[in-house]
Swiss-Prot record:
<comment type="similarity">
    <text>Belongs to the UPF0246 family.</text>
</comment>
<protein>
    <recommendedName>
        <fullName>UPF0246 protein MS0374</fullName>
    </recommendedName>
</protein>
<dbReference type="Pfam" id="PF03883">
    <property type="entry name" value="H2O2_YaaD"/>
</dbReference>
<dbReference type="InterPro" id="IPR005583">
    <property type="entry name" value="YaaA"/>
</dbReference>
<dbReference type="GO" id="GO:0033194">
    <property type="term" value="P:response to hydroperoxide"/>
</dbReference>
<dbReference type="GO" id="GO:0005829">
    <property type="term" value="C:cytosol"/>
</dbReference>
Amino acid sequence: MLAIISPAKTLDYQSAVPKFEISQPQLTQYSQQLIDICKQLSPAQIASLMSISDKLAGLNAARFADWQADHNEQNARPAIYAFKGDVYTGLDVESLTSDDVLFAQQHLRMLSGLYGLLKPLDLMQPYRLEMGTKLANKKGKDLYAFWGNVITQTLQQALDEQGDNILVNLASDEYYKAVQASQLKARIIKPVFLDNKGGKYKVISFYAKKARGLMCRYIIQNRLTEAEQLKEFNLAGYWFDEAASTKDEFVFKRDLGE
């Protein structure tokens, strides 16, 4: 079983990181091409392209300028310890054991606008480049055109290496769109998390993101290998609704109350 999640805009490069045998990102030759484009952009152009403040644009212009093809423990940190955000709050990597993290290294991947696909212990330098960014490049008008089938092929390789064909899509639509799902030799399971607020079950973004992280945590801690095992997920009050689910879309519901 291989799970995929989105990255996060919020990054942490300050806190301590446990000692692991780190890995190198696989697609840095592509990352370098994107960095070369981004280095040509002024802070004002970055602000416009990414719809961010001038202050954030200045920070990210500096990050692009500082980015190096050589990733080491002085200029980078393992991706799973760098990303912070709702999904990663649910995952809560700081409380996972070393064995859990090593399991995740085989069974979890993070999609990325700059790096394409990351393993948890892949070194990553600070950046901001969301997959939906309309960054013109030699292959087209945006990052979907740039990555083409590269992410899909790398994902297939990861699926093959971990031993089965089950892919659990816990990524946002923006990032999953970079995966050419029809090209994968995989059974793709999509968990959906609905919260009952005011008498109606619906996707509430903040809760759904955190739940996707919780599902990752559940897969990792319980060493799941079968799709059916996902249905037993019950963290944070969620329960599997068989009637609302389909063969490959697993619906989990939770009652928040009024």
